[in-house]
């Protein structure tokens, strides 16, 4: 599996700046936001453009899109397929049913997660923890600091990033024990689990009859629940 190369996925995602601009303009956002979106579009045309952390925090705080910051660049993580949404919803509903009453919580994709090696934070499709949720105020918003499980539903444009660079950053979260990478165009899940000695092991499940054991939560996750209602007739494009 090829490792994530920062320039390529970022440029791919920045093409959604046009959509972001239209959203702001249609809703008559403030002049500042329009200017911020224009800067985002200009960045796509000019990769040398860099944002300060303060500029990013203001843009993300007021945006309806999920924006991430890395090395002075801003890129959009929103914009998914129907299959992606269905899989995310299936996992959320099933995990919530399994851990309800145990003091655990499942967070959806709008939850900011503090990532020590890639400040200020990242967005995941799903994050889960058992016990008290802990937050840190970053740029006026709360970022979760203690997830135990993170789930990413893979898209063609983000798979290399989610498997490579993003996972390398997630590993800097002290409480993280488990990471799931879920394909959307075929039944396939990669599970990475952190052992007591700090090393990560990985397993693959690629049949609808398979079941994953989630040690971080003490429950099982059948693939048939993940892919309920999802068609594999054609590959997803997002």
Predicted ranges, named:
Residues 5-10, 21:
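Ser/Thr/Pro/Gly-rich low-complexity, intrinsically disordered segments
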Residues 19, 23-238:
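Gly/Pro/Ser/Thr-rich low-complexity, intrinsically disordered segments predominantly at protein N-termini
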């Amino acid at each position: 599996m090829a490792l994530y190369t920062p320039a390529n996925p970022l440029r791919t995602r920045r093409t959604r700046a046009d959509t972001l601009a239209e959203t702001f303009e249609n809703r008559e956002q403030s002049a500042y936001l329009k200017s911020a979106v224009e800067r985002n579009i200009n960045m796509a045309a000019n990769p040398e453009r860099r944002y300060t952390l303060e500029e990013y925090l203001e843009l993300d705080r007021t945006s309806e899109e999920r924006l991430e910051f890395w090395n002075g660049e801003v890129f959009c993580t929103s914009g998914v397929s129907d299959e992606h949404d269905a899989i995310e919803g299936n996992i959320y509903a099933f995990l919530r049913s399994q851990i309800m009453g145990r003091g655990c919580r499942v967070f959806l994709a709008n939850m900011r997660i503090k990532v020590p090696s890639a400040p200020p934070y990242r967005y995941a499709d799903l994050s889960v923890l058992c016990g008290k949720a802990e937050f840190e105020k970053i740029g006026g918003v709360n970022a979760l600091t203690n997830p135990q499980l993170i789930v990413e539903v893979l898209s063609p444009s983000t798979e290399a990033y989610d498997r490579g660079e993003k996972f390398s950053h997630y590993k800097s979260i002290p409480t993280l024990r488990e990471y799931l990478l879920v394909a959307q165009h075929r039944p396939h899940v990669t599970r990475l689990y952190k052992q007591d000695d700090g090393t990560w092991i990985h397993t693959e499940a690629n049949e609808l009859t398979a079941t994953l054991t989630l040690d971080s939560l003490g429950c099982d996750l059948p693939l048939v629940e993940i892919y309920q209602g999802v068609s594999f007739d054609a590959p997803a494009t997002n």
